[in-house]
């Protein structure tokens, strides 16, 4: 599990982590932009190391429920700040008000995409869209 730190700088003070949209391994940007790296771990440091070691190949990272539960909104923010697009795979499914608020938080920290269950119905799905849009503004 991720330990508590005062800031993201403290969390990563011993790590060198620089993301470049230019690939050193000559992976074309149009390919890199279509690939997502699934960060299916429960530790933000491990996720960051994994993304850092593979940044030449992926333009998007997927933050799932496991990592988001362990590290919270920082699990999205640290990767958007590093230049990745973030797909937040939280599978939102609740009352529309709750889904709206959750999607707004995820959007405010930079997630480009978030999943929501269609079985939640039209009102809930619209709430997810509106929340993500509001958070991104």
Task: Indicate residue ranges for each PLM-predicted region.
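Conserved N-terminal beta1-alpha1 strand-loop-helix module at the mouth
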Residues: 9-122, 127-136
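Acidic, serine/threonine- and proline-rich low-complexity intrinsically disordered segments
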Residues: 1-11
């Amino acid at each position: 599990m991720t330990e508590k730190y005062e800031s993201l700088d403290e969390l990563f003070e011993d790590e060198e982590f620089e993301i470049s949209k230019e690939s050193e391994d000559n992976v074309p940007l149009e390919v890199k932009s279509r690939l997502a790296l699934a960060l299916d771990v429960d530790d933000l440091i491990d996720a960051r190391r994994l993304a850092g070691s593979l940044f030449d190949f992926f333009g998007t990272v997927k933050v799932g429920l496991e990592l988001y539960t362990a590290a919270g909104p920082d699990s999205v923010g640290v990767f958007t700040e590093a230049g990745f697009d973030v797909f937040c795979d939280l599978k939102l499914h609740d009352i529309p008000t709750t889904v709206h608020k959750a999607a707004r938080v995820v959007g405010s920290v930079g997630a480009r995409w978030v999943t929501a269950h269609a079985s939640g119905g039209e009102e809930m799905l619209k709430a997810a869209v509106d929340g993500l849009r509001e958070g991104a503004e």
